């Protein structure tokens, strides 16, 4: 389980002009919603939100400390909107969760073993960066791992090869391609021959 992150928030006025003023003042307008929850328009500090997303991604349980409320709201980031030119976050949707109930959200795919595949003469082309999962908020993984260190032949690697931790269900179609391995110049045989030649060459006397 990931550590629960902390985020400051305050209620805000709605409307495009109010949102524009908030962004100029260093805040991101957003909303908290969820099953049985009255939607609440909020704003969060831009720097704090950007740092949280950059360091931890979107797949984390967050304690949103809304100004004036005694207890934090347990939320996850459901959607981020970014400026097409600056990539700065312009709006954020938070889903308020019950830690005892499962939720669906998107987390990144972490590929390991890519260097081994490249040493075998394979070119790795990434097709899918994130995957939708279902789990309890307390079991959200940082990422879903895909290990391709054992791939020796060209071809697609699909969602079926993802290693989901206990308590996490991957919702994507198992046949969806995550990445493709193709032969580089010289192919697998030449790369293996070069590797063997390199390992058999000892240090100069």
Swiss-Prot record:
This is Large ribosomal subunit protein bL25A. It comes from Symbiobacterium thermophilum (strain DSM 24528 / JCM 14929 / IAM 14863 / T). InterPro entries: Rbsml_bL25/Gln-tRNA_synth_N, Ribosomal_bL25/Gln-tRNA_synth, Ribosomal_bL25_b-dom, Ribosomal_bL25_C, Ribosomal_bL25_long, Ribosomal_L25_dom, Ribosomal_uL5_bac-type. HAMAP family: Ribosomal_bL25_CTC. GO terms for biological process: translation. Belongs to the bacterial ribosomal protein bL25 family. CTC subfamily. This is one of the proteins that binds to the 5S RNA in the ribosome where it forms part of the central protuberance. GO terms for molecular function: 5S rRNA binding; structural constituent of ribosome. GO terms for cellular component: cytosolic large ribosomal subunit. Keywords: Ribonucleoprotein, Ribosomal protein, RNA-binding, rRNA-binding.
């Amino acid at each position: 389980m990931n550590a629960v992150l902390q985020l400051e928030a305050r209620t805000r006025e709605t409307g495009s002009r109010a949102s524009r003023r908030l962004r100029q003042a260093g805040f991101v307008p957003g909303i908290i919603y969820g099953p049985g929850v009255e939607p609440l328009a909020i704003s969060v500090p831009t720097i704090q939100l950007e740092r949280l997303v950059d360091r931890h991604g979107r797949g984390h349980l967050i304690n949103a400390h809304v100004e004036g409320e005694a207890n934090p709201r347990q939320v996850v980031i459901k959607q981020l909107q970014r400026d097409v030119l600056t990539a700065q976050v312009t709006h954020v949707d938070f889903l308020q969760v019950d830690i005892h109930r499962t939720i669906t959200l998107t987390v990144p795919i972490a590929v390991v073993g890519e260097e081994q595949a490249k040493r075998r003469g394979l070119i790795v082309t990434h097709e899918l960066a994130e995957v939708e999962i279902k789990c309890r908020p307390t079991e959200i993984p940082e990422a879903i791992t895909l290990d391709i260190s054992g791939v020796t032949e060209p071809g697609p690697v699909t969602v079926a090869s993802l290693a989901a931790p206990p308590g996490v269900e991957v919702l994507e179609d198992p046949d969806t391609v995550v990445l493709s391995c193709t032969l580089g110049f010289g192919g697998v045989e030449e790369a293996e021959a070069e590797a063997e030649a390199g390992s058999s060459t000892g240090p100069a006397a």
